Amino acid sequence: MAASKLMQEIHSIGDRLLLKLQRLPQAEPVEILAFSVLVVFTATVVLLLLIACGFCCCQYCWPRRRGRRTQVGPMTPP
């Protein structure tokens, strides 16, 4: 029952989005600007996620540079 309601909700959201896209050429400039801002924001988030995932995946492929380690001893009193 819950799966069918979820599918109906997704279908109704898709229908509303399609209707908005069809009415966009006749929309007011404010609506076009708001829609453009939402599209740019969504694209930016997706792009940043792809960059982050790519960086995390590729980071483990490269050999890590290990510097020379120096041992630290206790300080001698002056």
Curated annotation (Swiss-Prot):
Compartments reported by the entry: Membrane
GO CC terms, sorted: membrane
Membrane topology: Single-pass membrane protein
Record key words, sorted: Membrane, Transmembrane, Transmembrane helix
Pfam families: SMIM5_18_22 (PF15831)
Major subcellular location class: membrane
Disulfide pairings: none
The keyword Transferase is annotated on this UniProt entry: no
Transmembrane segment boundaries: 32-52
Keyword flag Transport: no
PANTHER family: SMALL INTEGRAL MEMBRANE PROTEIN 5 (PTHR37344:SF1)
Name the UniProt record assigns to this protein: Small integral membrane protein 5
Organism, scientific name: Bos taurus
Gene it is expressed from: SMIM5
